C-alpha cells in the first residue's frame, strides 16, 4: 500500500509538533479543505484517529476525552461554516480549561468577500472559545516557515500551560496535493 502525505509544509510542521508534544488523539470531521491534513494523520500509526461527521458532536467528544485522559485532544474540520458548530463545546472547554485543539482547514483568505462558497471571515473569533488563536499560512519563504513553527508552538504550549484551555489553529491548505512517503 502506498502512503501519501500532504505537501502543505505548514501542515507537516503542525503534525511533527503534535508528535513532539505527545498529542495523539484526533477527532476528524473531514471536509474538502482539511482532507490533506486528515489524510496525513490517518496514515500515521502514531495517531489515534476518531471519525465524527457532525462537528458539534466531535467537539463534545473532545471535551469528554480531554476530561477523562487529561491529555490534549485535536478536533479538525473545514474552517468555514462547519467550524461554527464547534462553538458550544469550545465555550465549555474554555470555562473548564480543557486542552481541546481546534485545527480548522481554510482555503485562501483572498477568497473572502468575493461570493465564493465556504469563504467567510475567519480573522476574528469569539472571546470565550479559545485562549490562543493562530493562523498558519502557506509557507513560501524561510521567514514564513519560522513564523509557522513559532505560532504552532505557541498554540500547542498554551493548550496545557497555566491550567490550559482550548486553542484554535487555522491552517491554510492548498488542496489536492500529496506526495508519496519515501
Language-model-detected regions and their locations in the chain:
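N-terminal alpha/beta PP-like core and its mobile active-site loop of ThDP/TPP-dependent enzymes
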Residues: 1-182
